[in-house]
Each structure stands twice: as C-alpha cells, then as structure tokens.
Amino acid sequence: MLNFCGGETERLAMRLDTAVFQRGLTDSREKARRLILGGFVSVGGQVVTKPSFAVAEDAAVAVAANDDFVGRGAYKLLAALDAFSVDLTDSVCLDIGASTGGFCEVMLRRGARTVYAVDVGTGQLAARLAADERVVNMEQTDARTLTRESFAVPPDFCSVDVSFISLEHVVPPLAARFDCRFVALVKPQFEAGRADIGKRGVVKSAAAHERVLDGFCMMLERNGLSLSGLIPSPVRGGDGNAEYLAAFSRESSDFTPDIRAVVRSALA
C-alpha cells in the first residue's frame, strides 16, 4: 500500500490529479483525472486509480500511456468498478446501451472473458471492439426482450447505461431474468418529472435529484433488489447533467445510502 506520512511530507501532500497537472504531465486537471481513473498513472512505480490520492511533493509520478478509450463514458464505469470493488476477471459481461463501447472496453481491460454489447441502434460500436473476438455485437436489440436463451453462458455482471427511457422500464425485466451483479448509470434527465427539467434538459434542483434517487431505490426494493453502493459519476453527461452510479443485485445488503450527501457532492 502506498503511504506518505510524516511532518514535512504530509504538509506538502497534494491530490494526485493536481500533481499530474501541475507537473505538466497533462494539459488539464480533468484530463489528469481521466488518466488516473483509466489506470495510466503510477506513483512510485505502483498504479493508483484514485484522483484524490495524496502524494508528496517529491513523489515519483509517471503517466504510463495515453488515454485512448473509445468513449468518455469509460471513466464512469471505471469509477464504479473501483468504488464498488467489482472484479471482472474471467467474467461474462452484459453491456446494456453499449453505444460506441466505452463500458465494453473497460470490461475487456479489466479482464472480462466475453462482453455482450447490446444497443437498440446500429453501426455505433467502435470498429476495434466490433472486431474483437471477445465481443458479441448485439445491435438493434431491445434489452427488454433479452432472455436466458439469448446467451450461451449467463452473464456474471451487467452494466446499464440507457437514454430517453427510465430505468424503471429496463432494470426490472433484466433483473428478473439474470441473477448477476449490476451497475446502472442513473440519469436524472430521464427520470425526473417535466417540471424538474430546465433549459437544455438539465436538472439543477438538488431536491429533484434526491427524488430521482429515492424513486430509484424504491424501484429496486419493489423488484427484490438490494442497493450495495451509490456514488456521483466522475464525468457529467454531455448536456451537463450530474449523474450517479448505483451497484445492486439480488444479494441482500445492509448498505444505506446518504442520498442528500451524494447529491450534494454531485452538484458541487
């Protein structure tokens, strides 16, 4: 475990994303944050994936590779996997709302054996992913129509990142058919009532965000699912909306979210 302590060193400690930016290793702190989440930054020769990790002023910080994910959404799933301690090694994964494949690529880099990339659209999956033998491209497919027979091997893990439809209509049918771990991206702009959605589709009210998350938690409970983690997404939606990442499954959990604190952090 990396640990920097002691009087002078502790006094000079700073966030890793700040250190990467200030040392000129990237052109913005946001870029530094993405590189760290992507596993491209090491401290003292050890990879660190937490942007807030404290490093000493004289610590050896290095950027090992360029950021080359096919989509910015990759950083959302990376944050979730780390926050919720999800290990995808040799897993069969289901990527609902695959689009260009940001989540799909993260799953592969984290050791997934097979990824089923499901999307209602067509021709969106990045060429390098469509050509990867570990990826099964299931375009023009409505996730709500999937059954156990849709897959040779049932999924161990399922991510859900959908737009223009509420999770209320997507999660229940998936959870009823697949007994696996889930991580869903909760997007207030597609869950809130019309009165809560402002100009350009942005939901700004903290109260509206809290209502969305409360409703999401109640939906899980109604469907026999237990929430095991909830964090703000490290990357906002393309329209500027704050979003959330939730982990859940049929396995019982004693996790109780502090929704107000999560929303406050997301909107800060």
Regions found by a protein language model. Give the residues of each.
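Flexible, glycine-/basic-rich loop-and-beta segments that form/coincide
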Residues: 242, 250-268
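A basic, amphipathic helix-loop patch mediating RNA/tRNA/ribosome contacts
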Residues: 4, 8-59, 92
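Conserved class I S-adenosyl-L-methionine
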Residues: 89-99
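Short, glycine-/aromatic-enriched active-site segment of Class I SAM-dependent methyltransferases
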Residues: 188-205
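A short glycine-rich, Lys/Arg-flanked "PGG" loop and its adjoining helix->strand segment in the class I
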Residues: 168-183
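Conserved SAM-binding loop of SAM-dependent methyltransferases across substrates and taxa
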Residues: 100-111
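Conserved alpha-helix/loop element of class I SAM-dependent methyltransferases that forms part
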Residues: 73-91
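S-adenosyl-L-methionine
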Residues: 116-165, 169
